[in-house]
Amino acid sequence: LFQEERLISIIDYLKSNKRITVDVICELYDVSRDTARRDMVKLEEQGRIVRTRGGAILPTLSKEVGNYEQRLQAESSSKLTIGKAAAGLIQDGDYIMMDASTTVLHAATALSSKNNVVVTSSIEIAAILTRKDQTTIHILGGVLDNKHHSVYGAKAIEMLNDYHVDKLLIGTCGITEEGLSAPNEEDSYLVRAMMQHADQVIVLADHSKFGKRLFHRVVGFDSIDILVTDQALSPEMKEKLLASEVEIVYAEGDDLHD
């Protein structure tokens, strides 16, 4: 097996058995201990496992996310690839809504369509879009979150009642087979409200977000139309998404669709 295939298989094993050891990886995949350790290091870097003495377990509840600068730097190449693929889903004249995700920021940067109207809760995305002459920008009001460079609160949700868009682009801090999750109530409320004012919901999620569960559940997969990601999904995750009629776009090479 190639490494990525082993990594997916290791996660599947952990979902069934809760814990895996270096020796088990060596036995299951006929690899050396050094290769088994490299696989675990890779999964740990992706946030998909927690390493223990001699092995690994799946991560438990994630309690925090980094500030804006930290999130922007994390998995930056994956986010760039996903952002470009998501921007390719936008057509001339589309009315769009964008949340304050750093992956969505890359979609805003890559946007090449003309005559778009964009509603956003992100001051960074609004600033980027000012460089695009044929784009009209609406910024939601509310409380400014200095840590995440975005607005939130009752005023922002109330303002959404003035808009309805063709497409909503959102990121997520965590995605499991139960759906999307966020670290705080404000994010959950705002994203849910945005979904009520969009014909199509497009979620941008790099590989590090899978298997990560945060305190507040946002929505299940029935509320999503398209998922744009950068790596192959586990069979269980793919089955859950397709059962909810979610279109999967792999942002690698020639964008693949399921």
Feature-to-residue mapping (PLM):
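Short glycine/serine/threonine-rich phosphate/pyrophosphate-binding segments
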Residues: 103-107, 210-213
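HTH-adjacent hinge/linker in prokaryotic transcriptional regulators
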Residues: 2-23, 27-28, 34-100, 108-113, ...
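Short, active-site-adjacent cap segments at secondary-structure transitions
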Residues: 57, 103-106, 126, 176-177
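Conserved phosphate- and dinucleotide-binding cores of soluble alpha/beta proteins
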Residues: 2-5, 11-12, 19-25, 45, ...
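Amphipathic, positively biased hydrophobic alpha-helical segments used for protein targeting
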Residues: 65-66, 97, 104, 182, ...
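Active-site-adjacent beta-strand anchor residues
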Residues: 97-98, 119, 184, 230
